[in-house]
Amino acid sequence: MRTQIYLTIAFCTAVLAASPASAQVTYGKKPQLPAPFATESAGNGPSETKPPAGFLPSVPAGFHINIFAQDFKQPRFLAVAPNGDIFLADTGGGKVVVLRDPQHTGGAQQREDFAEGLNRPFGIAFHDDYVYVGNTGEVLRFRYDKRTSKRLGDAEHILDLPTGGGHFTRTLAFSKDGKKLYISVGSSSNIDFEKDQRRAAVLVCDPDGKNSRIFSSGLRNAVGLAVEPLTGEVWVSVNERDELGDNLPPDYFTSLKDGGFYGWPYSYIGGNVDPRVKPQKPELVAKAIIPDVLLGAHVAPLQFAFYTGKQFPESYRGGAFVAEHGSWNRASRAGYQVAFVAFKDGKASADPVPFLTGLVPDPGGKNVNGRPVGVAVAPDGALLVSDDGAGMVYRVSYAP
């Protein structure tokens, strides 16, 4: 079986619009991967990420895209409140912003700060009368008015999180029954051993921060974190390790098992040993779980959202939209798009296919036209996509 290095990019736009689930299924199969160092490790980050004036990304036939909101410092995680308001983590600005479209124009007419002075906020979740925010070193919660989205009082600190090194994002998601809070914490490095076992892991705790423990481990940097609505399973999108070559290893999108181990730093995609890591732990590698869906090497998947709306065609219902921030460690760029993964009965049923594209004018060039980060399904079924390269939020609607 071929390695998933985005061969699906060959699918034409018409096929994507009509049948996004038509790609070859890899779910549950053991992938064949290239050898480590089959190519040199390339340092190839983009020089410029701002799009030219008037630019809009491409979407499949029948869909429409427009700018929903703009002029943010670093727009990242998106979340939809129970009342339909859109919450956005403007990470570079150290704040959480509320966006509204009361006249249903397709653009945010109202914009106000919910909380400021935060430390690189990212994850946002709602539970009872609280808005939860993942700062890089802690979980905070704010009591708020669920009708108006107005904050009621100061932040309450409920849990310390490890800090330092790389991978500062802290993503939050509540269990289907609301009794547990899941928190993703990335590693501090590429492949070094961690002193704090809570890194490169997904944690779980009570809504008040008590009884925290490791839920799943061996996850180098699980930036995306959400609960699948039908099954209640926890899913993550994972940024795998760098500097093994252009096509190794694939980043991935997978469900998690309580107590499951996913390889890092000893191995990747199951039992594929990283020769740089010494000493090895073969007993752990033997337990490493193969992820559900491979996304492609170095595409940098960040937030994802399960499509729970009714506006898009039936073939998109229940599937997942995955924002790919884009590569720096490939000679030719990969990612820089939003991909779609079809689901059936709460399980991934097909390879990912491109959905929002057009951000890379020249795969061998230095400039790109944006870097997707966040995705969320708006109350009307449109898809919202934050782009921290462009400093804006796009809205994708279906209008055949």
Could you say what each language-model-derived stretch is?
Residues 24-60, 169, 187-190, 197-200, ...:
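Beta-propeller domain segments
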Residues 67-72, 112-117, 158-164, 214-218, ...:
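Surface loop/turn motifs at the tips and blade-to-blade linkers of beta-strand repeat domains
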Residues 85-89, 130-133, 180-184, 233-237, ...:
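Conserved beta-propeller blade signature
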Residues 376-400:
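Blade-level signature of beta-propeller repeat domains, shared across WD40, Kelch, NHL, RCC1
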